């Protein structure tokens, strides 16, 4: 049976932010003709960690500089209490900015975003739109809950009730359940599932899993409401940025409502929807998704003209979602 070091064969890197160690993967080629390669920054959501991107890092790091942080409270990063760390969206964006600045990554960035990582990554992009070269969107969001999409009951319980706190922090229900329901083609291998849940192994170490859910704004006045609205408004700056969307249509949270939200906001995006895949699309359809991402980055290595990037956006915006089925 595979060990974590076998499944996740990367050197551990750490940066100290506000007294807390943030772990990140940093894999890159030796150099291409002395020129620094484009950076591919992969931002995970909840309840996962940098492990989610392990196969993508291995597929891209021969050509690109891959950076994958574990948010504070997740993965191999420190997991401080509320008295020592501000578990909020704004702080997550600050952390990502601090990490990238420490690595002197300030241009030619490809953002790969999943789950709440979309909000964090696009929050960073809103601050520095000129740094973003490409977007890769995987079952994620950078805007509020669509009006047509009620908050799923399971998330509402986790977000708003004492029972939810007990289930998430006492029994690791959120992370454990996600490792089962987040894939649809086939169950996760036991060693992979254990790797997903391993960092969240105690009441203290599950704090971020709960705080992420509690950080979701649902109405004006909620913490993050104004910030999420501003991130949403900033998306209009990226309608000429090459974008690819790879989406599992069996995601019970980030479903067609969110996908259609992206199509409305970024009509230039290339779309590949997988009818038989769930939330963890990099587990369900790893080979297909990675092949699409490699091709997409290679094809956009030379920036296209604005006219090419935005050709016929009205047609793209109104296009019907065509599921990929078992293969795309």
Can you say where each PLM-predicted feature lies in the sequence?
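Conserved HGGG/HGGXW glycine-rich cap/lid loop of the alpha/beta-hydrolase fold
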Residues: 27-79
């Amino acid at each position: 049976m595979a060990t974590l070091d076998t499944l996740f064969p990367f050197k551990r890197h750490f940066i100290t932010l506000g007294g807390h160690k943030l772990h990140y993967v940093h894999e890159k080629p030796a150099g291409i003709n002395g020129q620094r390669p484009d950076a591919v920054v992969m931002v995970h959501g909840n309840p996962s960690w940098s492990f989610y991107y392990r196969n993508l890092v291995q597929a891209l790091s021969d050509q690109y500089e891959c950076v994958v942080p574990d948010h504070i409270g997740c993965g191999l990063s420190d997991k401080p209490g509320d008295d020592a760390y501000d578990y909020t969206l704004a702080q997550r964006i600050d952390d990502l900015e601090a990490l990238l600045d420490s690595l002197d990554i300030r241009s030619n960035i490809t953002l790969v975003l999943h789950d709440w990582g979309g909000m964090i990554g696009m929050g960073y992009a809103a601050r520095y739109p000129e740094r973003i070269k490409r977007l890769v969107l995987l079952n994620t969001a950078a805007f509020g809950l669509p009006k047509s999409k009620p908050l799923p009951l399971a998330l509402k319980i986790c977000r708003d009730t004492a029972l939810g706190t007990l289930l998430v922090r006492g029994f690791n229900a959120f992370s454990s359940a996600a490792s089962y329901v987040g894939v649809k083609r086939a169950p996760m291998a036991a060693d992979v599932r254990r790797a997903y849940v391993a960092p969240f192994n105690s009441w203290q170490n599950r704090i971020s899993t709960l705080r992420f859910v509690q950080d979701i704004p649902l109405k004006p006045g909620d913490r993050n409401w104004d910030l999420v609205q501003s991130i949403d408004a900033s998306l209009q700056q990226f309608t000429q940025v090459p974008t690819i969307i790879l989406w599992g249509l069996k995601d019970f949270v980030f479903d067609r409502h969110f996908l259609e939200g992206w199509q409305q906001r970024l009509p230039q995006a290339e779309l590949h929807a997988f009818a038989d895949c769930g939330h963890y699309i990099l587990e369900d359809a790893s080979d297909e998704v990675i092949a699409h991402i490699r091709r997409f980055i290679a094809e956009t290595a030379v920036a296209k003209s604005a006219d090419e990037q935005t050709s016929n956006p009205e047609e793209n915006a109104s296009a019907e979602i065509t599921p990929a089925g078992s293969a795309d």
